[in-house]
């Protein structure tokens, strides 16, 4: 049983993203993005607010052509070393993911997509600080999926 109550708190932080399309020729495009965020939160009595995610910084490269798209995405999640009362700190980790698909047109309004997707490719132990289950169960490890998607 848990009891949740509202308390006065101050949140400070930022979020930023910069994207740049470095190649654009006909149906072929490529871009890069960098991003990051940071949140600090304290109750008015000076205690840390619980389940505040740590800072993160990352980058993504996206590319596409007439019949294909893809991206590679890396995000560094910092250590959460300012946990709230009754919380444990969370270690830092890096997530690397990739995705690519190939489009096969099946007429005027439908297509088939063949895709491959990889998540947590570095097989990091991920404990999402904002999760109530972080101390009991990490997120899933490396996952690679092959698939087929039909779109109308």
Task: Locate the predicted segments by residue.
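Gram-negative outer-membrane beta-barrel transporters
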Residues: 2-80
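Hydrophobic, lipid-facing positions within transmembrane beta-strands of outer-membrane proteins
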Residues: 12-16, 55-59, 94-100, 142-148
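Short, glycine/charged-rich beta-strand-loop motifs at protein surfaces that mediate ligand recognition
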Residues: 83-90, 100-103
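C-terminal beta-signal and adjacent terminal beta-strands/loops
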Residues: 79-81, 102-152
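Flexible, surface-exposed loop regions and adjacent strand-edge segments
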Residues: 1, 48-53, 78, 87-91, ...
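Residue-level preference for beta-strand/loop junctions
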Residues: 10, 28, 53, 92-94, ...
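Outer-membrane beta-barrel transmembrane domain signature
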Residues: 88-95, 152
């Amino acid at each position: 049983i848990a009891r949740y109550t509202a308390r006065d708190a101050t949140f400070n932080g930022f979020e930023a993203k910069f994207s740049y399309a470095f190649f654009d020729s006909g149906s072929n495009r490529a871009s890069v993005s960098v991003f990051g965020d940071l949140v600090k939160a304290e109750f008015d009595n000076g205690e840390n607010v619980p389940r505040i995610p740590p800072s993160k910084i990352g980058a993504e490269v996206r590319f596409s052509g007439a019949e294909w798209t893809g991206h590679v995405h890396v995000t560094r999640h910092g250590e959460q070393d300012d946990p709230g009362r009754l919380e444990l700190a969370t270690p830092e980790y890096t997530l690397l993911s990739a995705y690519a698909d190939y489009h096969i047109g099946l007429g005027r309004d439908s297509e088939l997509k063949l895709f491959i997707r990889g998540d947590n490719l570095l097989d990091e132990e991920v404990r999402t600080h904002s999760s109530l289950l972080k101390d009991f169960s990490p997120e899933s490890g490396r996952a690679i999926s092959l698939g087929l998607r039909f779109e109308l």
